[in-house]
Amino acid sequence: MACAGLLTVCLLRPPAPQPQPQTPRHPQLAPDPGPAGHTLFQDVFRRADKNDDGKLSFEEFQNYFADGVLSLGELQELFSGIDGHLTDNLETEKLCDYFSEHLGVYRPVLAALESLNRAVLAAMDATKLEYERASKVDQFVTRFLLRETVSQLQALQSSLEGASDTLEAQAHGWRSDAESVEAQSRLCGSRRAGRRALRSVSRSSTWSPGSSDTGRSSEAEMQWRLQVNRLQELIDQLECKVRAVGPGPHKGGPSWYPPEPGPCWRPGPHSVPSQAPRLEPLREEDLAKGPDLHILMAQRQVQVAEEGLQDFHRALRCYVDFTGAQSHCLHVSAQKMLDGASFTLYEFWQDEASWRRHQQSPGSKAFQRILIDHLRAPDTLTTVFFPASWWIMNNN
């Protein structure tokens, strides 16, 4: 009877569902990162886009790409050609597409850079998690591998910088042969991406900027420095008098930076006590003797983002020390506004050629890279020429 009941239950049970044939699943592919260099360009042009609106105005385009070779008209023509709609807003994606179409032999280079960037970030994350728990031998191996990786990358960077500097020097040479020298005032900004630290300049003991710099001031250069420092003292006196007779300090007014002697203030080795120097009158014959008797003064005004002030201070001190040590730099000083985030940098050079060589030096390029990362607005660069006779003073 029990067996009959069990048989009845088995017959009444609904049939078990038949297994459905499995459809083969294709492995999910990683999202396409886009053409080689596209990710890199996006990061580069994002820093050039100060408004973070995904577009570059011509002013932002000029600030980032001006290299002293292409004229303003040529830059405008390039901007309009990429834009295609004759607007003043160029989408960064269009800019990425434009450069992606012109990569040529650098296509595999940029693709390798993007892969290298991902690999380095992954290795750094793993090192951060595993290094402290690793044995001493494993820690030693990690330090060795990291040090050798840095060495190999620095060797590649040196080769690339050498080629870049050579091409830029040639381009500036061709441009100077075709154009006359004239005073100019323009907005200027860094034109390259990268975050190379200024310490790479200070660690180089064999590099000397400019092929004609000897590193030792001649007697004539010492006289130049003496005259420039005297003029600087005269300017200081005049500014003090203006502040004394004018209204009291107000927000946004100037104050000398730094207020005490420090690495960022370079009065020069030939400063003399103030003796109320006077300027000699201009003589017409001095103007007819050519550009050799003209001094160039470069004024750079910057507005630093609050979160980048500390890094900017360090970079500014390094740059002022580096610039003041150049044999053709007559004087360099920095001024800080009372708002704490605005600065004016003054550089006096013996001639324009020396200043332009300095602009192409590793120290100057490193400082410009710091600027593009930490400024809240494009910096303003103004250059003015002074006849040499204006700087001749006497103490009688």
Curated annotation (Swiss-Prot):
Domain EF-hand: residue ranges: 36-71
Protein name: N-terminal EF-hand calcium-binding protein 3
Cellular-component GO terms for this entry: cytoplasm; endoplasmic reticulum; endoplasmic reticulum membrane; Golgi apparatus; Golgi cis cisterna; nucleus
Cellular location(s): Golgi apparatus
InterPro entries assigned: ABM_dom, Dimeric_a/b-barrel, EF-hand-dom_pair, EF_Hand_1_Ca_BS, EF_hand_dom, NECAB1/2/3
Tissue specificity statement from the Swiss-Prot or TrEMBL entry: Strongly expressed in heart and skeletal muscle, moderately in brain and pancreas.
Residue ranges, compositional bias (Polar residues): 206-217
Post-translational modification: Phosphorylated by NEK2.
Composition-biased stretches (Pro residues): 14-34
Origin organism lineage: Eukaryota, Metazoa, Chordata, Craniata, Vertebrata
GO biological process: protein metabolic process; protein secretion; regulation of amyloid precursor protein biosynthetic process
Function: Inhibits the interaction of APBA2 with amyloid-beta precursor protein (APP), and hence allows formation of amyloid-beta. May enhance the activity of HIF1A and thus promote glycolysis under normoxic conditions; the function requires its ABM domain and may implicate the stabilization of the interaction between HIF1AN and APBA3.
Boundaries of every ABM domain copy: 296-385
Residue ranges of the region described as Disordered: 14-36, 197-220
GO MF term list: calcium ion binding
Entry-linked Gene3D superfamilies: 3.30.70.100, EF-hand (1.10.238.10)
Region spans: Required for interaction with APBA3: 181-190
Domain of life: Eukaryota
Subunit (UniProt): Interacts with the N-terminal domain of APBA2. Interacts with NEK2. Interacts with APBA3; APBA3 seems to mediate the interaction between NECAB3 and HIF1AN.
Residues binding Ca(2+): D49, N51, D53, K55, E60
The species this protein was found in: Homo sapiens (Human)
Gene for this chain: NECAB3
Keywords tagged on the record: Calcium, Golgi apparatus, Metal-binding, Phosphoprotein
